[in-house]
Amino acid sequence: MRRLSSILLGLLIFFVSCQKNKHEIGKPAIDQDQLLNGITTDTFDLITYTINEDSAITDNMANVLLGSYVDPKFGKVSAEFYTEFRLKSLNPVFGDVGTIVYDSCVLALQYVGYYGDLSAQNFEVYELNDSLSMDTVYYDFSTKPVKPGNLVVNGMGTITPKPLTNTVVNGDTLAPQLRIPLDTNFAKGILEESTSGNGTFASNVNFQTFFKGFKVKVNNPSQVIGKGGIFYFNINNNAASKLTIYYTQSGVKKSYDIVMNSLAADFVHIDTDQSGTPLEMVLQDSTKGQSTFYAQAFRQRAVIKIPGLDNLPKNVVIHRADLTLPVQFQNGYRYKPGSAVSVAARLKTSDTRLSNLNVVGAFVDSKKHFAIDLRTYAQALVADNIDNTGVVVSPVFFRNSAERIVFNGPNTINKMKPKLILTYTTY
C-alpha cells in the first residue's frame, strides 16, 4: 500500500466524514503526582461490532479513486469517478483543421497513492451524456448516464499501474502517471468543433455543454481474491492530470490540453459486494463482532462500547484512558490497516449523527494495534456531559481512500485482545 502524504493527512484529518459534527469534550489537565498515586484498572468488558454507513459525500474531494480489489474479508470493492473538463484558454486557434493528422489522445492522471497491489487492470472511459454541476451534492452511490462506446483504444485498456515509477513523456521525466490512450476519432471531434460556428470554445459553459466530461472506471470480472488495488489521483489541483490531444499539422508536432481542476465538478462512485464474507456475517449478527469486527472506508465503521464506564464514581479525575485495538495484519500483506483512525460518538442517546471527538488513534506498527486516548471522553462521561453510547472508529481517510481494518474482538482466538486501561484518582 502507498499511503497518502503526511501533508495530505494534515489537510484531510478535518474531513473524516460528511456525517460527523465536531465537538470539543474538554481536556482536564494531568497532575503527574496524582498519576503516580492513581488507581489503574484494565478489567472493563468491551462490546464490539460493525455498523454500515448510509452514504458519503464524494464530490470534489482532495483525490479521486479508481480501481478494484477483492478482499477475503470484505469482498469486492470497486471505485470509479466522473469529471468535467475545462478549457485551458478560450478561443484556441487550430488553423486549418482539415490538415491535422491525429497522432494520439491520452487521459493522464497523476498518482498520489494507492491501496492494494499493482496487478494489471482493465480501464474504460465513457463520455458523459448529462452535465455535472458544482452546485450539486454527489454521493458514493451517485451515477450519471453515458454515451455508448468505450473510448479507450481497442486492445490497450489493460494497464499495469506504476504509481512508484516516474513517467517519461516526449523525453521529459514526470511524476508517476496513469496514461489511458483514447480513440483519436474522439479527439478529431473535439478539434473539428472549433469550426462549427457554435462558439463552443468561447466559454467554459459552452464547452461543457458540448463535452460534458468522462466516466472513468475499471472492468475486472475475473479478478481473484487477494488481487487488485485502488489508486488515488489528484485531478483538482494538478496540472499534470489532463486530457491531451497529440497531432501533426504541416509536419509540425503539436498538442492541445483540456484540463481538470478545482472549478470542474467531479465525484467518486463506490461499489462493494460483501456476499458470503466474514464482514457480512458480523453485519447480520452483531454478536459475531465479539470475535472479529471491521471498518472500511466509505462503508463500515467499528463500534466499541464500554458499559463499565457508567459504574465509575462521580468524584474521580481521569488521568489516562488508553484504548488499544489490535488488528489482524501480517507484515508484507498488501491490504494494510492504514496509518490512523478517527474517533467519533453519538454524544446523546437521541443523536442521529456522529460527532467527531477530535481524537486520532495512531497505528503502532511494532505492536500491530491502534492506540487511542479516550481520557477526555471518559471524563465527560463521569461528568454526565455525554451519554455512554460507545465510540465509533473509522479509517482516518474515510472519504479519500480504500483502506479497511480487521480488528480483534474481546473473544478473538488471537493472543492480543482490545483493552481499555484506565488510571484515575478520587477526591
Predicted regions and their residues:
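Secreted, disulfide-rich extracellular signaling modules
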Residues: 2-8, 12-427
